[in-house]
Amino acid sequence: MSKNNSLKVLLAGAECAPFVKLGGLADVMGTLPKELNQIGADARVIMPFHSQMKGKYGAQTKHRADFNINFAGGETYVGVEELFYNDVTYYLIDNEGFFGDAVYRGGLAEGEQYAFFCRAVIEAASRIGFIPDVIHCNDWQTGLIPILLRTQYGHWDIGNAKTIFTIHNMMYQGEFGFDQFEHWLGIDPKYDTPEFMHNYECASFMKAALVFADRLSTVSPTYAQEIRDPAFAYRQEGILNARAGDTWGILNGMNQEEFNPETDPLIPYHFNKDDLSGKKKDKIELIKNLGLSITPGVPIIGMVTRLTEQKGLDLVK
C-alpha cells in the first residue's frame, strides 16, 4: 500500500520516548507509530516541544509553520517543528510559555498547558497539510481534542477525522471547574452537564474524551473490564459501561529491540531462552549492587514503577 492510500494516523500525547519519558505513556508513543507504519499505515506523532528536548534534538528539526490560535480570550503563538527520527515523523508544538519548563506543571497551570495543546494539535495538523483519518489521543492531556473537533472544527478540512482515546490510567482525569474550559477554549456551557463533561463537583478532560471520542481503548483487555467497576472507574463507571461496545482492551506490547537480553548494553551478562546462565550471573550482580546477602535459591523481585498505592506496593513484603 502506498503512503498516499495509507490510513493516516496522528498520535497525540504529552511525552514520547526517547525524547521525554516520565511514564509508560512515553514508551507507547515511542514504539506504536513505527509498528503501525510497518503494517502499512502512515502514522505520525504530535507532541509538545518540551525544553528538555531542544538541546539534543533542536538542531535536527525543520520549521513547518507558525500561527496564532484563539486561546483564553486572546491570540496565542504556536510554532510547529518537524523531526524525522527512527523512521517516524514527529510534529513538535512550540511555545516557550507553556512548554519551556516542566512537562507536567500540576494543578490549574497544567490544565491550561494542555488545553492549549489540544487546540494547537488540531490547527497544526490542518495548517501543515497532514489531515489524519484518525487522531489517537492518549491520556487526559489530549482529552479535549474530540470535543473540539466535534463542536468547533466541523467546517475545517480536519473536521471529519475520527478519534480514539486511550485510557492509560483512569486515576488521572484533568478535573477543573467548567468555567476554566469555557475561558480557555470557549466550550459551550451546555456541555457542563453529567451527560457531557460534568462529573460530580467538576468537569474534566477525561469525561469529555469518554463522551466525544469515536472509540475508546485501554492498555489491556483486563483493564477494559476493570474500569467498568466502581472500584476502578474513579466515578466514571456510568459512561464507561454505556460505551462498553465502543471500548477495546489492547495489550501493550514490548519493544523487543530495546529490551532484548541477548543484546541489552545495560546488563553485564547476556542470555537467551536456550542459555540462561547469564541471567543467574546478572542476579548476583544486582544483589551485590543492592548490598544484599547472596542466598542461593532465594528469588529477587524488582518492580519498575511509581511508588504509589495504585501500583500494588501493599502486596510487596
Locations of regions flagged by a protein language model:
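Catalytic cores of nucleotide-sugar-dependent glycosyltransferases that transfer UDP/GDP/TDP-activated
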Residues: M1-K317
